[in-house]
């Protein structure tokens, strides 16, 4: 659960970030920093270099899609597990994504968010946003239990 202040900080952060851009950058960084994640994106074409990843339209599109899902999840703070139930099942039973990657992605989302918000990404906002991301990660991992 989230306090009123945490909820306000989460809404504030999600309301200020350029969702498409943060998603594209975060997914690109995930793939670049954690090269084993490339196996999940074989259909995306060339992921052979930083340049290729950063300019890959499929990476950008999928990253934006993921971030839109996270931004929409803000409306479901009280029941993230239900909100992500279907997506959790897909990632577990169809895509076979290692749930540890959700945590890696969440950390990168926080970093990229900080890059975009600068000094407006205060320690309090970061703490609330990262708590939210941890809950999203846990909700996505539900299908694995």
UniProtKB/Swiss-Prot annotation:
InterPro entries found in the cross-reference section: Globin, Globin-like_sf, Globin/Proto, Hemoglobin_b, Hemoglobin_oxygen_transport
Gene Ontology terms for molecular function: haptoglobin binding; heme binding; metal ion binding; organic acid binding; oxygen binding; oxygen carrier activity; peroxidase activity
Domain Globin, chain residue ranges per copy: 1-145
GO biological process: hydrogen peroxide catabolic process
Keyword Iron appears in the UniProt entry: yes
Alphabetic keyword roster: Heme, Iron, Metal-binding, Oxygen transport, Transport
Entry binding sites for heme b: 62, 91
Alphabetized Gene3D superfamilies for the sequence: Globins (1.10.490.10)
CDD domains: Hb-beta-like
Tissue spec. comment: Red blood cells.
Cellular component annotations (GO), alphabetically ordered: blood microparticle; haptoglobin-hemoglobin complex; hemoglobin complex
Quaternary context: Major hemoglobin is a tetramer of two alpha-1 chains and two beta-1 chains.
Summary of the function given for this chain in its UniProt record: Involved in oxygen transport from the lung to the various peripheral tissues.
Protein name (Swiss-Prot/TrEMBL): Hemoglobin subunit beta-1
Organism, as annotated: Triturus cristatus (Great crested newt)
UniProt gene name: HBB1
């Amino acid at each position: 659960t989230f306090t009123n202040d945490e909820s306000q900080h989460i809404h504030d952060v999600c309301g200020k970030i350029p969702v498409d851009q943060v998603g594209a950058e975060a997914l690109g960084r995930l793939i670049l920093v954690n090269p084993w994640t490339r196996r999940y994106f074989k259909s995306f074409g060339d992921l052979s270099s930083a340049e290729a990843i950063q300019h890959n339209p499929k990476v950008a599109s999928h990253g934006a899609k993921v971030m839109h899902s996270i931004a929409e999840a803000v409306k479901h703070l009280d029941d993230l597990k239900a909100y992500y139930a279907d997506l959790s099942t897909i990632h577990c039973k169809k895509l076979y994504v290692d749930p540890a990657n959700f945590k890696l992605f969440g950390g990168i989302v926080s970093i990229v968010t900080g890059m975009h918000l600068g000094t407006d990404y205060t320690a309090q906002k970061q703490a609330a946003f990262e708590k939210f991301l941890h809950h999203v990660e846990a909700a996505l991992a539900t299908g694995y239990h």
